[in-house]
Amino acid sequence: MSEKQSPKTSEAECSAMDLPEFEDEENWLFKVLGFQPGPSSALDDDTDDQADEPLSAAEFLHLQDILQEDRVSSTDDEDTCQAGCTEDDETSHSDRDIDNNVKVITGNIKASPSMYMEMFTDQNPQADQDLEETESDGAMNPTD
């Protein structure tokens, strides 16, 4: 029951079968870009020479049009994002907390919790002072 299975096609046959499919994709790409494909040997062997050849005016303009279309579509997306929020919206929703003292602490709280507690208690006197000022102004405290 243990028969050795031989592959139905060899590796050389598989690579030969893939080649026409690759050439079709290559021709499609040239067709989309508007180029005339050269012989396959020119594509494979003379890549340095092709890079030195200048584009014709028609090829250059066609590529420039394609790039311009991409820029226009990406610019439209940015305009759509910007249109949702105007300058009036930004100012009406601001906190007006310009003078708030905010500190960002990064690190591992599990490694040295005492350091974080010290920083927290250092900030509390300022918060207590702000609370006293609010109460002395007669403002309502929403937490009461």
Swiss-Prot record:
Q: Name one GO cellular component term.
A: cytoplasm
Show the ranges annotated as biased composition (Acidic residues). Answer: 75-90
The record, for Pfam families, names: TSX (PF17397)
| Highest taxon of the lineage | Eukaryota
For biological process, the GO terms are:
adult behavior; fertilization; male gonad development
UniProt note on tissues of expression = Testis.
Question: Which InterPro entries does the UniProt record give?
Answer: TSX
Region entry Disordered: which residue ranges? 1-21, 69-99, 120-144
Q: Report the protein's function.
A: May have an RNA/DNA binding role.
Name the UniProt record assigns to this protein: Testis-specific protein TSX
Q: Which organism is it from?
A: Mus musculus (Mouse)
